[in-house]
Regions:
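A C-terminal cap/extension of S-adenosyl-L-methionine-dependent methyltransferases
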Residues: 50, 149, 153, 158-216
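A short acidic, Gly/Pro-enriched loop at the edge of an enzyme's catalytic core
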Residues: 62-73
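A short SAM/SAH-binding and catalytic strip from SAM-dependent methyltransferases
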Residues: 73-84
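Conserved class I S-adenosyl-L-methionine
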Residues: 102-127
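Acceptor-substrate binding/catalytic loop of class I
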Residues: 107, 127-146
Length: 216
């Protein structure tokens, strides 16, 4: 619903292309970048199988191989908590955005609640774990105030901040985690099975968007 300045979009950390394909279906001219060769190979094949024209490149968010002011929109979803240098990634996002461009993001907060949900339940406890060990590192999670400071420092003004949570009660959520662990749900079905929704609660994950100053 947000009015966008144009239809060129960069998906940073695109992985297998799940979101890149949705953006392409919405009419964006999409470029995806990721450091993982195998993920990009899978993304290219899946896009071709679905007749989607997406430009996939190999690279890292810390050194985006694009000229200044290349994109109307940059998206970085489930990625910021994994990067080696967050400040450099945000600087590169701001550099490649056109003035007035929009940066969409979601990431994980660094709280005791996120440690329970993302580290303990998803990675460490045998009964529920479905992620590989060290897929997430709690110390790399990002408090909202920290991210907003990086955005402001690079001429990006945050417009909205919303939490991401599950509508399910704790027992139903544990059942979903068990289904993922036992292989009854694939990665594309994880989100729907968790029944995620927007919330005011930022304790685990949060999302938002920022706009690059038209004068930058």
């Amino acid at each position: 619903k947000l009015p966008l300045p144009g239809r060129t979009l960069l998906d940073v950390g695109c992985g297998g292309g799940f979101l890149a394909e949705e953006f392409a279906r919405d009419g964006f001219a999409v470029t995806g970048i990721d450091p993982a060769t195998r993920s990009l190979e899978a993304a290219r094949k899946h896009a071709a199988d679905n007749n989607l024209d997406i430009d996939y490149r190999e690279g890292k968010g810390e050194a985006l191989p694009f000229p200044d002011a290349s994109f109307d929109v940059v998206a970085c979803c489930d990625v910021l908590e994994h990067v080696d240098d967050l400040s450099l990634v945000i600087r590169e996002v701001a550099r490649t955005l056109k003035p007035g461009g929009v940066f969409f993001y979601d990431t994980v907060n660094r709280t005791w609640f996120s440690k329970l949900a993302v580290i303990k339940l998803s990675q460490e406890w045998n009964f529920t774990r479905w992620c590989k060990p060290n897929s997430h590192v709690w110390e790399k999670f990002i408090k909202p105030a920290e991210l907003l400071a990086f955005l402001n420092r690079n001429g990006l003004t945050n417009q909205e901040l919303r939490g991401i949570s599950s509508r399910k009660n704790p027992l139903a959520l544990l059942a979903s985690l068990r289904a993922v662990k036992k292989g009854k749900l694939n990665h594309r079905a994880i989100g729907p099975s968790f029944d995620l929704c927007e919330t005011e609660d930022l304790r685990v994950s949060y999302m938002g968007y920022a706009i690059k100053s038209p004068r930058v």
